[in-house]
Amino acid sequence: MRNSDLAPLYRSAIGFDRLFNLLESGQNQSNGGYPPYNVELVDENNYRIAIAVAGFAEQELEITTQDNLLIVRGSHANEPAQRTYLYQGIAERNFERKFQLAEHIKIKGANLVNGLLYIDLERLVPESLKPRRIEIK
């Protein structure tokens, strides 16, 4: 019987390669997938999370990190007056979205454009973990 060692495949998954699996685990929260988000590959070491936060002003959004956990919260300062809707398709509720980040990830910044909150991420692999060429003498 032949055994396959998959460890070399996991060794190449430093940082962001594992990020997608970790982000999916954050999707299993009780918020029912609200607000929706995308994860975009910008280049080899840069990623962007886009979160749909229509209806929230910049001062109503909070982004924090603790250990390897990115937390995005949205809360309306003034609750809207009681309204009678014929149809309500736009969610106006407060939210908290958590993302488990992989190792060696730095949050570069965030900006709010047209109802989308963009969070830019960068993979910074320490020199000690990067491949290096050994000279043969």
Curated annotation (Swiss-Prot):
Record HAMAP family: HSP20_IbpA
Residues annotated as domain sHSP: 28-137
Subcellular location, record wording: Cytoplasm
The protein's name: Small heat shock protein IbpA
Main subcellular location: cytoplasm
Chain's gene name: ibpA
Keywords on record: Chaperone, Cytoplasm, Stress response
Description of how the protein assembles with itself and partners: Monomer. Forms homomultimers of about 100-150 subunits at optimal growth temperatures. Conformation changes to monomers at high temperatures or high ionic concentrations.
Similarity annotation: Belongs to the small heat shock protein (HSP20) family.
Any one Gene Ontology BP term: protein stabilization
Domain of life from the UniProt record: Bacteria
Function: Associates with aggregated proteins, together with IbpB, to stabilize and protect them from irreversible denaturation and extensive proteolysis during heat shock and oxidative stress. Aggregated proteins bound to the IbpAB complex are more efficiently refolded and reactivated by the ATP-dependent chaperone systems ClpB and DnaK/DnaJ/GrpE. Its activity is ATP-independent.
Native organism: Yersinia pestis
InterPro entries: A-crystallin/Hsp20_dom, ACD_IbpA/B, HSP20-like_chaperone, HSP20_IbpA
